[in-house]
């Protein structure tokens, strides 16, 4: 195989709780992860030169060893002693630095793509172990679907599929440092923790409204005071028909779960006209 086309899908957190902090600075979490339909397009092609060439539609995105796709390719080349190089055409649609694991999903696709291009037949479980070396979300981005993530996010338990629902995604024009958010969380007196087990139970019942009502993200207690526009977008979504709305990951992206496509599109138009979020996308839950 000389070339492969891949779709790197975004994720949202239906629930995100932080259990504690490790001595190495990492945090133990419990998260309910869900893949959505929004995706980046990736084309990977083998080339004879010993190079990794990345082309992207985002001008400020690094295309060197600071890019997670580059890191994933280099990891596979070194691990399995692969000759030749790779050219990558990365067409991004997932908002950057948005709490939606866009970079991690791109890296997951790069691992998967290298496995296919070089016909390595590396088991998925082994790819997921390699993924942790790139980032905590990469193993989940290989698994996709509905899952409980524990540890630093790498311990995954497959959950029943989240029922189909309409999801509106809105990213305000601010970039959030995940590292900063977690550092500030250590000094924040968090009084309200999301009911992760309750969210899982609602998913098992296939009750979208119940899932939405139980959604919660402990990181909102840090990010929203820093960027109040996040709370404004949440309120706008709920006032315009969302069953509930929440920040994904460390932010700043907000997603809302809607009962129907019509109300979702109406809210999208409102948010675009208001102008607090430049990137507003309609999507849906994705089941692999």
UniProtKB/Swiss-Prot annotation:
Highest taxon in the source lineage: Bacteria
GO terms, biological process: isopentenyl diphosphate biosynthetic process, methylerythritol 4-phosphate pathway; terpenoid biosynthetic process
Record-listed E.C. numbers: 2.7.1.148
InterPro entries found in the cross-reference section: GHMP_kinase_C_dom, GHMP_kinase_C_sf, GHMP_kinase_N_dom, IspE, Ribosomal_Su5_D2-typ_SF, Ribsml_uS5_D2-typ_fold_subgr
Full protein name: 4-diphosphocytidyl-2-C-methyl-D-erythritol kinase
Keywords linked to the UniProt accession: ATP-binding, Isoprene biosynthesis, Kinase, Nucleotide-binding, Transferase
Pathway stated in the Swiss-Prot or TrEMBL entry: Isoprenoid biosynthesis; isopentenyl diphosphate biosynthesis via DXP pathway; isopentenyl diphosphate from 1-deoxy-D-xylulose 5-phosphate: step 3/6
Pfam families: GHMP_kinases_C, GHMP_kinases_N
Swiss-Prot/TrEMBL catalytic activity: 4-CDP-2-C-methyl-D-erythritol + ATP = 4-CDP-2-C-methyl-D-erythritol 2-phosphate + ADP + H(+)
Molecular function (Gene Ontology), one example: ATP binding
Family note: Belongs to the GHMP kinase family. IspE subfamily.
PANTHER family: 4-DIPHOSPHOCYTIDYL-2-C-METHYL-D-ERYTHRITOL KINASE, CHLOROPLASTIC
UniProt binding sites for ATP: 95-105
Organism field: Lachnospira eligens (strain ATCC 27750 / DSM 3376 / VPI C15-48 / C15-B4)
Its biological purpose: Catalyzes the phosphorylation of the position 2 hydroxy group of 4-diphosphocytidyl-2C-methyl-D-erythritol.
UniProt-annotated catalytic positions: 11, 137
